[in-house]
């Protein structure tokens, strides 16, 4: 659902037909995400969450030709944030809760749908940044940075590899 009205409609329909309404954000239900949650403590004080999910839409070429398919119709909640950006934001909220401050920018297409965006979130003692796009590609991973190390997730939408890297000892007198 993309708004409160749709949520109420879905709840009513599930009650009417006696079926279970379930969350569809599959990546947070996987063993790899559970591993991330269980290992956050290894990072020490967490200072940053960064996530990127940019995937050039197979429908964008048609859009550039003037054909607006459903993937770029805002009335269907099919902008980049609602379609794929949510995969970067939802895990962050699950792990760290509601941010104190949000600052966002993006590119709005002629249809009114957002094609891509960047969002900065502020938490107490921590920052988060997410990038998302349906009009460009990226292969950047998701990373959670702490004072004692970091955890990298290869892809936030389908978490395959999770890697913990401990902080390297600081070198005295040479560089950072």
Language-model regions, residue ranges each:
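Beta-strand-loop-alpha-helix segment that lines the small-molecule cofactor/substrate pocket
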Residues: 1-25
């Amino acid at each position: 659902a993309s708004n409160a009205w749709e949520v109420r409609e879905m709840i009513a329909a599930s009650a009417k037909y006696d079926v279970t309404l379930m969350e569809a954000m599959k990546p947070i239900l996987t063993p790899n995400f559970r591993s991330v949650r269980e290992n956050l403590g290894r990072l020490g004080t967490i200072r940053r969450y960064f996530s990127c999910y940019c995937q050039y839409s197979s429908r964008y070429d048609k859009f550039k030709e003037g054909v607006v398919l459903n993937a770029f119709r805002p009335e269907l909640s099919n902008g980049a944030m609602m379609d794929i950006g949510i995969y970067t934001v939802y895990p962050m909220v699950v792990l760290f809760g509601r941010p104190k401050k949000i600052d966002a920018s993006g590119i709005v297409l002629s249809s009114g749908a957002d094609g891509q965006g960047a969002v900065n979130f502020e938490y107490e003692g921590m920052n988060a940044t997410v990038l998302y796009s349906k009009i460009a590609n990226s292969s950047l991973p998701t990373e959670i940075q702490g004072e004692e190390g970091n955890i990298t997730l290869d892809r936030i939408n389908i978490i395959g590899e999770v890697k913990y890297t401990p902080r390297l000892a600081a070198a005295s007198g040479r560089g950072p």
